[in-house]
Amino acid sequence: VADICAAPGGKTAQLANAGADVIAVDRSPSRTKRLEQNLNRLDLKADIVIADATEWEPNKKFDAVLIDSPCSATGTIRRHPDILYSKTTNDLAKLLKLQWKLLLTGAQLLKPGGKLIFCTCSMQTEEGEQQIEKFLKLNRSFERQPISKEEVGGYSCFINEKGDLRILPFFLKELGGIDGFFASRLICK
């Protein structure tokens, strides 16, 4: 598995803990150091590469690629209410371009039959659903592999009409809420 926006390593650790061989790629040396510290603390292993994922050229293709993309982070609003005031329209435009480049990069890294997971902690459909719809429209060799409620603890409210994971901050309000999140699983035909 290639995790191409890996730092600080939470999802890398989950993949490694599940038994996956993970190559964790991130462009930030300081954040990559934190990723390494987190893996060491958890006694988990992953190959760590410091590189801009959009320019990284590994010598192999992968069964799966995870893109936990940089985003506006609007899904964290319940913990960071100032998030709505700290991002501009220009910031969003730059993030959308980067997300698109990461999607195209991730697609190129996959073996046939491989899975591409794209996720953000944004509530903005431009950074989630719209990116995936645009990608599928322009990349006919991919199709959505719907996420089932059984894969997310039986919470059918977490799954949108297309089969993507779409969590909103008011979900699980009896437990204090949850961060907003989007994830889509695509398969390379």
Regions found by a protein language model. Give the residues of each.
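S-adenosylmethionine
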Residues: V1-K189
